[in-house]
């Protein structure tokens, strides 16, 4: 029975949390998430890059019903990880197209690959590749950058690179030499109109306790991902629900843009405000829920569960000791009653008159 108590308490607490009133929305913010659902086999085909970018631009101009509205009333446009399958910062025509797409005051938040010289000099030395979240102003100028810091081994970098490359394994990474990691701890993005943003690219959203790495608490999580690698397996739903758990742990709203799904807006209690299913093509127009007060996990981290585990271990130990004491006392009382009955029987036998024939 003791073992069931934690599960029952978690269930009751979860029902109570989910039944609460909807979180208030951030003032004067209206986002559009674009899920173009580009097949993974086409994503990195050089011959299809222009068509994919043009399709991304066109889909962004339409509301969820398919009506063309040219982003009227939208303050922030969200594209998924590597939405532009090329290096947009190396293509001025792409930046011009972004500027032509965005109305005055609207910003684009998009995943993209980029090159940068790493070191003291920005003009000398080899350039390194980054998997990045880029924020563009309404004229196509770059405003902010977040570079992914938790890279996927063998997918984005090659562990023991020198050794493995010597035996011909560098082809395991798409980018020769692999991607480089961004600045740590994870910096927060300052985006006009939004609370401080923690950018999360792909599977950076699956690690509990690691989505916030600085002293300042963000007010919003933005997760850009491409789960097309997983196809129609259980991978995309699992990845989505893991990111929802991060929102619950931190009490923060989550905006998730995925190339093939699942894209969604989730509040700080893990409730889905809006969603596009796996392989569904379309857009989400939504407000952004406000952050909640930091829940226990956000304040204490894994000590929350360690403390609960110790508490219920102590309760189980106390219950086991109590049962042992009860059993021992029961045996003692039983022995005492048996002894009393034996003594009484002996006394009765001694007192009985002896009759002779």
Question: Where does each model-flagged region fall?
Answer:
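Enzyme catalytic cores with a strong preference for nitrogen-chemistry domains
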Residues: 1-357
